[in-house]
C-alpha cells in the first residue's frame, strides 16, 4: 500500500478482502476497493464501513446476475466488477445502477506498459471510453 501511495495512487484495489489492509488504508485516508465474491465478504466490507467493493472474479462468480442478486439484500453496496469483463459485456455491466465502474486487463496489457507504448494505451483507452458511451 505504501509503495502505491508513494507512486501517486489515489485509491487501492485488491483481489480480496483483508481487514488489516482495509483498516490501514482507512488510517491513511486512501479509498480501497477490496475484492469480494460472497455475501459473507460483503458483510465484512460493511462492517469495515465500506460501501463500494470490487466483485472478483466477476464472470466466474456469476457475472451481472450474481451482482443483481447480491444487490437485493445489500442495496447500499456498489460494485466494480473485474475478471472476465470485456468489450462484449462491459456495457451490460455498466447499465446496472449498482455498478460504479468496471475493470479489465483487456484495456491495458502489461506488454504495452513494459514496452512504453503509451500512445497505443491512450488509443485503447479512447476506444474503451467510446465503447461505453455509445
Residues covered by each model-derived region:
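Catalytic cores of alpha/beta
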Residues: 1-7, 40-48, 72, 85-101
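Catalytic beta/alpha-barrel core
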Residues: 1-2, 8-17, 31-38, 42, ...
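Glycine-rich phosphate-binding active-site loops on the catalytic face of alpha/beta enzymes
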Residues: 11, 15-21, 54-64, 98-120
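Aromatic/hydrophobic pocket-lining residues that form π-stacking "cages" and hydrophobic walls in ligand
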Residues: 21, 25, 41
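C-terminal helical cap(s) of enzyme catalytic domains, especially alpha/beta-barrels
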Residues: 25-30, 111-134
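A generic structural signal for alpha->beta connector loops
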Residues: 29, 76, 98-99
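A contiguous pocket-lining binding segment that forms or flanks enzyme active sites
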Residues: 49-54, 66-70, 75-76
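Active-site phosphate/pyrophosphate- and oxyanion-stabilizing loops and adjacent acidic/basic residues
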Residues: 68-69, 91, 126
Amino acid at each position: 500500500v505504501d509503495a502505491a501511495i508513494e507512486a501517486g495512487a489515489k485509491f487501492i484495489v485488491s483481489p480480496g478482502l483483508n481487514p488489516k489492509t482495509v483498516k490501514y488504508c482507512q488510517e491513511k485516508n486512501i479509498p480501497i476497493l477490496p475484492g469480494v465474491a460472497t455475501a459473507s465478504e460483503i458483510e465484512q466490507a460493511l462492517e469495515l464501513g465500506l460501501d463500494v467493493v470490487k466483485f472478483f472474479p466477476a464472470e466466474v462468480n456469476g457475472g451481472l446476475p450474481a451482482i443483481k442478486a447480491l444487490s437485493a439484500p445489500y442495496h447500499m453496496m456498489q460494485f466494480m466488477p473485474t475478471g472476465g469483463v470485456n468489450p462484449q459485456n462491459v456495457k451490460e455491466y455498466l447499465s446496472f445502477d449498482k455498478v460504479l465502474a468496471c475493470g479489465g486487463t483487456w484495456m491495458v496489457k502489461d506488454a504495452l506498459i513494459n514496452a512504453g507504448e503509451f500512445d497505443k494505451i491512450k488509443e485503447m483507452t479512447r476506444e474503451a471510453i467510446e465503447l461505453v458511451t455509445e
